[in-house]
Every structure is written in structure tokens, then in C-alpha cells.
Amino acid sequence: MAQGCIFCDIIAGKIETEFVYEDDVVVAFADIRPIAPTHLLVVPREHHATLADTVASPGGTAVLGRLLKVAGHLGAARAEADGGYRVVINNGAAAGQTVYHLHVHVVSGRHFAWPPG
């Protein structure tokens, strides 16, 4: 757990949050500032600041695999009703990362243009 990390505080139970999914590696919960009708965050229990940090860490590949597997299951559960879903990882300030604890956004329920932005 990292000092001052909101996601670490959520995982530790210091901030009350309803998990829509949890296992021994990841948790998932609704984003407090959703950009779509469905906007979930899938977060590893272990603190990794960025995608790059996770890739470089021992066991990072397994963490990433679990994040994507859970994101895929959560997205697929809503895909039929929503017509599809988007999975996003923002890595670094220039990419829009605001919480420096790796997380995957699963968003659906509205049309998303390409390119994003």
C-alpha cells in the first residue's frame, strides 16, 4: 500500500466503496466521475504507479493479465445491453492519468468516437 494513494485506501477499506468484483489480485468498482452510463475501474490490490512500473516488476505480467481478463468479463457482461464497451489504460500525465495506481477503465453505454478526445 502506498501512502496517500486513494485506490490503496479503497482497497484497505479506509474509504467505503462497493466492489462490483473482487478476488485476491484485483478489485473493481464504479468511477466517481463517470464519462459513460457504465464506467468501472479495475484496480490491482498491489500498488503499481503506472503501466510501465507494472511491466518492469516481477509478476507484473500476471497482474496485467488478470486486470484485462476481469475487464473483459465486466465489459462483456454489459456489452449486449450497451452495444459494446471500451477498455482504457492511461499511462502518465500526458495520457490523462490522474491517480498513480495502475487501473483499467471499462466504459460503455454510449457511442465513443475514434480517435478519442
Where are these regions (language model features)?
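HIT superfamily nucleotide-processing domains
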Residues: 1-117
